[in-house]
């Protein structure tokens, strides 16, 4: 059998992986083996952090709602409890935006919930 030189396809594959990790430092962007490992680690980290981002934002929203509701004399826990009791189910993201951008509206909403 004749010898087959692995030229074009192998180069294309390596070039694609090296292009993916081109922003890395040192050997991680130059050497193929190290770059290949770096790529797999980068994809694992990206997947993990996409899931973590959801948790982080939820924590941020809860913190903002808690700060705004405590300024009006009610804890976050009681505020959410009153919302469920009145069946006013709005998501935490919207509540946090109202609390940050329009604090007067949040205060009025809180007073209406407490009165009724």
UniProtKB/Swiss-Prot annotation:
It comes from the Eukaryota. Keywords: Chloroplast, Plastid, Ribonucleoprotein, Ribosomal protein, RNA-binding, rRNA-binding. One of its GO terms (molecular function) is structural constituent of ribosome. The keyword RNA-binding applies. One of its GO terms (cellular component) is ribonucleoprotein complex. GO terms for biological process: ribosomal large subunit assembly; translation. Binds directly to 23S ribosomal RNA and is necessary for the in vitro assembly process of the 50S ribosomal subunit. It is not involved in the protein synthesizing functions of that subunit. This is Large ribosomal subunit protein bL20c. It comes from Cryptomeria japonica (Japanese cedar).
């Amino acid at each position: 059998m004749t010898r087959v030189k692995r030229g074009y396809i192998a180069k294309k594959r390596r070039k694609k992986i090296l292009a993916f990790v081109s922003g890395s430092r040192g050997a991680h962007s130059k050497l193929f083996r190290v770059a290949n490992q770096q790529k797999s680690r980068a994809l694992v980290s990206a997947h993990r952090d996409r899931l973590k981002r959801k948790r982080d934002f939820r924590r941020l929203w809860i913190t903002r709602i808690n700060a705004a509701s405590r300024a009006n004399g009610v804890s976050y826990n009681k505020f959410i409890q009153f919302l469920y009791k009145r069946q006013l189910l709005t998501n935490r993201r919207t509540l946090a935006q109202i609390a940050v951008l329009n604090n007067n509206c949040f205060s009025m909403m809180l007073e209406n919930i407490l009165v009724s």
